[in-house]
């Protein structure tokens, strides 16, 4: 009988890879990680690349260093495979592109954070109605209030730029004086000059406006005595009138006769808490116009001395 021969070993038809070439070639061949690059036993480096859709290799040349061989492989890969080429090294153009992309991403992130900070500044810088605004015609300044008032009264809020701004301490008028009309006739110089009549109407606010919105004052805080003497005649040339009651209005005239304004009566009485907006810990009074006023007497500088 014929003896059975063992089956012949199949020849390795697989592709040669770097893993199967360990220990072969030059001393640095095993540590080289570049694609298509290998070292000869005498130390030279060679580069070769496979053609797309083919199994043949293209010889690229012999080089002194592995980096030069890797650069030759990258150039051939870009020509054969285009943008899908797998490169060994990052070339200066690609490196610059990567840096530009990183800068763009960083700048995009920075612009987002900058936009966020800008919104915060806008929020912190919101106009809460505490600023000053100067009138368009005249030498008066306007202090806005914490409360929104009717349109009929918003344009009449003017205070003296050089005065003491104590007009908000005036006693409240009776309900019968809800509306006051001041007629002023101004005449202009010249033979053909005529006169014009200006009418101003003021309406008092509701008596318990502050008490409806803020229940801050009760008990001993309800009333306190403030003596105030009012001059019968005072100069209103630098002011547009009192802040709330508008008892007098001055109409500028161009060389004509002076207008008649009603005189203020001397009043001494109680100052209602409705006229105040807030009393802080330092004894400062905040009026409806946003004015910060101190008490005229030292004994009333602090709230705990009011009892």
Curated annotation (Swiss-Prot):
**What keywords are annotated for this sequence in UniProt?**
Activator, DNA-binding, Nucleus, Transcription, Transcription regulation
Q: Gene3D superfamilies, from UniProt?
A: AP2/ERF domain
For this protein, the DNA-binding region equals: 33-90
Per the record, where are the segments of Basic residues compositional bias?
A: 8-21
Name where it's found: Nucleus
The Gene Ontology CC terms held by the record are: nucleus
Q: What role does it play?
A: Transcriptional activator that binds specifically to the DNA sequence 5'-[AG]CCGAC-3'.
Its name, as the record gives it, is: Dehydration-responsive element-binding protein 2G
């Amino acid at each position: 009988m014929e003896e059975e021969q063992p089956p012949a070993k199949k020849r390795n038809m697989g592709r040669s890879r770097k893993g199967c070439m360990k220990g072969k070639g030059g001393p640095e061949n095993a540590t080289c990680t570049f694609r298509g690059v290998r070292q000869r036993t005498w130390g030279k480096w060679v580069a070769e690349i496979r053609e797309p859709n083919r199994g043949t290799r293209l010889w690229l040349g012999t080089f002194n260093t592995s980096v030069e061989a890797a650069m030759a492989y990258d150039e051939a890969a870009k020509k054969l495979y285009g943008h899908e080429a797998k490169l060994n090294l990052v070339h200066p153009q690609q490196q610059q592109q990567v840096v530009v992309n990183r800068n763009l991403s960083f700048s995009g992130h920075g612009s987002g954070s900058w936009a966020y900070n800008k919104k915060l500044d806008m929020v912190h810088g919101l106009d809460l109605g505490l600023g000053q605004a100067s009138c368009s015609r005249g030498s008066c300044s306007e202090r806005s209030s914490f409360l929104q008032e009717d349109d009929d009264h918003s344009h009449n809020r003017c205070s003296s730029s050089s005065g003491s701004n104590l007009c908000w301490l005036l006693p409240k008028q009776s309900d019968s004086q809800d509306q006051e009309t001041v007629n002023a006739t101004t005449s202009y110089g010249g033979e053909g000059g005529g006169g014009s009549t200006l009418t101003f109407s003021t309406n008092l606010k509701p008596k318990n406006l502050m008490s409806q919105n803020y229940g801050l004052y009760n008990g001993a805080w309800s009333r306190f005595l403030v003596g105030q003497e009012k001059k019968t005649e005072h100069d209103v040339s630098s002011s547009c009138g009192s802040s709330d009651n508008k008892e007098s209005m001055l109409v500028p005239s161009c060389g004509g006769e002076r207008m008649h304004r009603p005189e203020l009566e001397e009043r001494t009485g109680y100052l209602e808490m409705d006229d105040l907006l807030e009393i802080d810990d330092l004894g400062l009074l905040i009026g409806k116009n946003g004015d910060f006023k101190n008490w005229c007497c030292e004994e009333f500088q602090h709230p705990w001395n009011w009892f």
